[in-house]
Curated annotation (Swiss-Prot):
NCBIfam families: folE, PRK09347.1-2, PRK09347.1-3. One of its GO terms (cellular component) is cytoplasm. This is GTP cyclohydrolase 1. Its EC number is 3.5.4.16. Pfam families: GTP_cyclohydroI. The gene is folE. HAMAP family: FolE (MF_00223).
Length: 180
């Protein structure tokens, strides 16, 4: 890792021996272990360990779960909120497990579209609800810091499965709950 940073510092015209940079390779290596720890965790295990037989057959919504991830194209952060709604069939999941699922997938190199899809597909596979919807809203620093340099752009993605895809009333109820 040190060789990587020495080459990086040289390429940008920086002195690798400058006082403020001496410990940078070690600090960044520790940071990267944290930022990309999602590769070492199984999202399916996180969900499987936190569900129980349900007594609810109405919509459940976990709203505005904050996250940050790293864009795989530019290695810059994107951050925002994810909301998950589902209608149980037999299994109810602990709310912290939804947050854990989001954290595992977001702590990987990502694009927002795949992040949203992975959360919905894993939830659908493990919990087997009558329907699931995932809505992700994020600000991308790659869009703010370079290229088009749009500071306030928010990107929204959604993935719908089951009743949320088939029934417009179910989808509308979820959207209304997000607004309230």
């Amino acid at each position: 890792m040190e060789n990587f940073f020495n080459q990086f510092f040289e390429n940008i015209g920086e002195d690798k021996n400058r006082e403020g940079l001496k410990e940078t390779p070690k600090r960044v290596q520790e940071l990267w272990k944290f930022l990309y720890k999602g590769y070492k965790e199984d999202p399916k295990v996180a969900l499987k360990s936190a569900y129980f037989q349900g007594v609810c057959d109405e919509m459940i919504v976990a709203q505005n779960i904050e996250f940050y991830s790293t864009c795989e194209h530019h290695l810059l952060p994107f951050l925002g909120n994810i909301s998950v709604g589902y209608i149980p069939k037999e299994k109810i999941v602990g709310i912290s497990a939804i947050a854990k699922l989001i954290e595992i997938y977001s702590k990987r190199l990502q694009i927002q579209e795949r992040l949203t899809t992975q959360i919905a597909e894993t939830f659908d596979e493990i919990i087997e609800p009558r329907g699931v919807i995932v809505v992700c809203e994020a600000k991308h620093l790659c869009m703010s810091m370079q290229g088009v340099q749009k500071q306030n752009a928010i990107i929204k993605t959604s993935v719908l499965r089951g009743l949320f895809k088939k029934d417009p009333k179910t989808r509308a109820e979820f959207m209304q709950l997000l607004k309230s």
